[in-house]
Amino acid sequence: TARYRALADEYDVTINLRPVYPLAIREPNFFERNHPNWMRYTFLDMFRVATFHGIPFGPPRPDPIVQDVATRKIAADQPYIFRLTRLGQAAARRGKSLAFCHEVGKLVWGGAENWHEGDHLKGAADRAGLNLAELDAEVLADAEALDAEIGTNQAALEASGHWGVPTLVFNGEPFFGQDRIDMAIWRMEQEGLVRR
């Protein structure tokens, strides 16, 4: 999300980040049925792209998705991801999902240990201009409606022609992955995108 946030800061464009549950939640057997090298390569590529772009990156501690790495089986008990995704959708209701998800992503994927404890998430919400206590109260009181909105986001993602994240959709055309951001900018410039 760092590169998407930079894109929104640098260009005259608004990015409406629409949170979805990760593929591991939407299709728990996805990882088990893929080639064993798929996960290894995906993580290798994530580290490589982050290093190439100078983005701090480290393994999540803990991973928001509880999974047996050896078998690739997704655990039935998921103590982190539902709260995180609902918080992201609550931020989306306020027009701040990109900022919030970027700040939380820096914690989770930036190597912060125990990002889910103490004031880590509060600090992320503060930096995004949000109040974590307010978001958490909404997550508890309105979980069903938030999940319905997340489901709508997931349907829109699949309707765009892709299933993975990050996917940027412009004029109905999906651009999947960090390596497609420059191509998305190129496409938007063809339609009149200008720098701020």
Predicted regions and their residues:
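C-terminal cap of thioredoxin/glutaredoxin-like
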Residues: 1-13, 101-196
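Structural alpha/beta surface segment adjacent to cysteine/selenocysteine redox centers
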Residues: 2-108
